[in-house]
């Protein structure tokens, strides 16, 4: 009986160490940024037709302007959007559908 208790204690200790290692390695990894959306402002200004358009925001970035909608000339901040990959699967009816991987 003592050997069984020792074995259970050993398994619990190994499991706790494994879980601790998983969490500590995740915390030490930094997010890699490519910098295309950082520390650059985007603008909302009128085009040649007088319509307010947003400029200075490349694909993959979001321009957030903290000004009222009626303010035509305004500056904003760019944020990088997260990217996800989608996979296409075929349903039983034969029509393709798009699903996000978990």
From Swiss-Prot:
Source superkingdom: Eukaryota
Keywords: Complement system impairing toxin, Disulfide bond, Secreted, Signal, Toxin
Signal peptide: 1-24
Tissue specificity of this protein: Expressed in salivary glands.
One GO cellular component, as annotated: extracellular region
Presence of the UniProt keyword Signal in the record: yes
Any GO molecular function: toxin activity
Annotated localization: Secreted
Signal found in the keyword field: yes
Major subcellular location class: secreted
Disulfide bond entries: 37-61, 42-63
CDD domains, sorted: C5_RaCI-like
Family: Belongs to the RaCI family.
Known function: Complement inhibitor. Prevents complement-mediated C5 activation by binding to C5. Binds C5 at a different binding site than the other tick complement inhibitors OmCI and CirpT1, and the drug eculizumab.
Entry protein name: Complement inhibitor RaCI6
Organism the protein comes from: Dermacentor andersoni (Rocky mountain wood tick)
Lineage, top ranks: Eukaryota, Metazoa, Ecdysozoa, Arthropoda, Chelicerata
